[in-house]
Curated annotation (Swiss-Prot):
Catalyzed reactions: tRNA(Cys) + O-phospho-L-serine + ATP = O-phospho-L-seryl-tRNA(Cys) + AMP + diphosphate
Job of this protein: Catalyzes the attachment of O-phosphoserine (Sep) to tRNA(Cys).
Organism in which the protein naturally occurs: Methanococcus maripaludis (strain C6 / ATCC BAA-1332)
Binding-site residues, substrate: H186, M187, T188, S231, A232, S233, Y273, Y274, N317
Protein name: O-phosphoserine--tRNA(Cys) ligase
Listed EC numbers: 6.1.1.27
Keyword terms: Aminoacyl-tRNA synthetase, ATP-binding, Ligase, Nucleotide-binding, Protein biosynthesis
Keyword presence, ATP-binding: yes
GO molecular function, one term: tRNA binding
Amino acid sequence: MFKREEIIEMANKDFEKAWIETKDLIKAKKVNESYPRIKPVFGKTHPVNDTIENLRQAYLRMGFEEYINPVIVDERDIYKQFGPEAMAVLDRCFYLAGLPRPDVGLSDEKISQIEKLGIKVSEHKESLQKILHGYKKGTLDGDDLVLEISNALEISSEMGLKILEEVFPEFKDLTAVSSKLTLRSHMTSGWFLTVSDLMNKKPLPFKLFSIDRCFRREQKEDKSHLMTYHSASCAIAGESVDINDGKAIAEGLLSQFGFTNFKFIPDEKKSKYYTPETQTEVYAYHPKLKEWLEVATFGVYSPVALSKYGIDVPVMNLGLGVERLAMISGNFADVREMVYPQFYEHRLDDRDVASMVKLDKVPVMDEIYDLTKELIDLCVKNKDLKSPCELKLEKTFAFGKTKKNVKISIFEKEEGKNLLGPSILNEIYMYDGNVIGIPESFDGVKEEFKDFLEKGKTEGVSTGIRYIDALCFKITSKLEESFVSNTSEFKVKVPIVRSLSDINLKIDDIALKQIMSKNKVIDVRGPVFLNVEVKIE
């Protein structure tokens, strides 16, 4: 906490001095907790849900009302809508199936089996029979069966489950039996039901939309087909409705997503629930992608199908696949990877990787941590001293009940060299998926590498860590370890850097895995010629 009164008094006497000196009150974060190792974390929406919401708002702006159509559709409705074509259409539908409820009796043999488990049945026989009978009749849910058996016999639920497994094997041998109910394969099957019910409830014309999941039994899933997808569908009912409404709605809807210029091409499929010559494919031009794309289909429902539902006015239906539009908007190549990214490779950008490169060894004690900055400044200031040369830094630390006198010597004995090597000020950058050490100056850098390094410096993401920074933290961390182990001296020698570990850096395994899988590189090679000797008294 600041001593506010002292600061105000100091500022009243000499504002400039107070302004400069109080900067030390703002303590900098430790290096592994500083930017870019810390990064903002944002929630992330899913592109399909984003597209759904954008489509919802687009429909609402155009005056449509939102409805939820039935997901479960009786196969009889498919026959009513498709006529003779229904059999072929039903091949792509998923049928709902359920397990039958076996007629399980409580015979003498089963009573004997239960009693062999150490449970007396005689006084609970009637209660157990009622439970089994209730299950058969459907008055008892299957997920309550074990609990009710346990309660009836006054035993634990574990023992109740054992009885179900060992005494009533009929439950293990059940096979699902299909019903006549299907999961809707397209939104049309629901629109007939909805429009039919609204005919006597809403004045004509009316405009409806629904965005929801459909299910289609594809032979296989691939980059453009899934067995479950979202349909963004609308229906307009009114006496004067025709395919011109479909064209206008397609333009109004899709122009809100950046499409311009539209082509309406007769669809060769000719589904029987549409009036002949009305089923139309919509192609739209996307200026950013610079290509024509098929994005929607519309048509006017057949009077034959409408009449079976008591609908006596034309109904235009337009539908488009949400995933298709999301792929276009997000420039995705594979619908599976877009919808289920968790099952595919997670891509880290350079900013992500930069947050995953950290110092390996960092001192814990604040006094020793602060010593690191002094050591860094001393090395940087004198890096070009001509050898033979030596720098010394001395400090005294309180450690427990003792004092530690520390003498740090940085030296170069060989003549004709600098105190430190030319790569000592190299800085770690992320660029194009690579981790690279970039020099402060490009003087002396080979031309074949210069362009890459220059781009890395201007377009990449810096970690803010230089070789000398990381190495000095290695020295002070080793000093702290020596305090604990009561070591009196140690040396640090780093001639040539070949890997991150040579300069006291580590990278998260997730980032490392991506770098290796993408054939990217970690190239931090460079001469630093650091020689340090530390004595502790």
